[in-house]
Amino acid sequence: MDLIGFGYAALVTIGSVLGYKRRGGVPSLIAGLSVGLLAGYGAYRVSNDRRDVKVSLFTAFFLATIMGVRFKRSKKVMPAGLVAGLSLMMILRLVLLLL
């Protein structure tokens, strides 16, 4: 079972709900829940086959790119820098699973 992947998905999902409660942005909530569900699906696939990282890798790369750009613009570590950093660590972990 890919506990790290499921934890990453849970953090993204919970973060989107907390961000919605704080700021009230419905598009951010929908995007965050969608990415969280996609990350959860990717973790499920990795749980069944450790080399099936395509969905998880795509999701982490997408989130790292989006949040990396937001971090570069805003210079705020929370939440953009934190999510970009976690996504980069997920990418590294997934690539290492392929080796």
From Swiss-Prot:
It comes from Mus musculus (Mouse). GO terms for cellular component: endoplasmic reticulum membrane; mitochondrial membrane. Gene3D superfamilies: 6.10.250.1330, Transmembrane protein 14-like. The keyword Endoplasmic reticulum applies. It comes from the Eukaryota. It is found in: Mitochondrion membrane; Endoplasmic reticulum membrane. Belongs to the TMEM14 family. The chain crosses the membrane at residues 1-21, 24-44, 79-99. Inhibits apoptosis via negative regulation of the mitochondrial outer membrane permeabilization involved in apoptotic signaling pathway. InterPro entries: TMEM14, TMEM14_sf. This is Transmembrane protein 14A. It is a multi-pass membrane protein. Pfam families: Tmemb_14. GO terms for biological process: negative regulation of apoptotic process; negative regulation of mitochondrial outer membrane permeabilization involved in apoptotic signaling pathway.
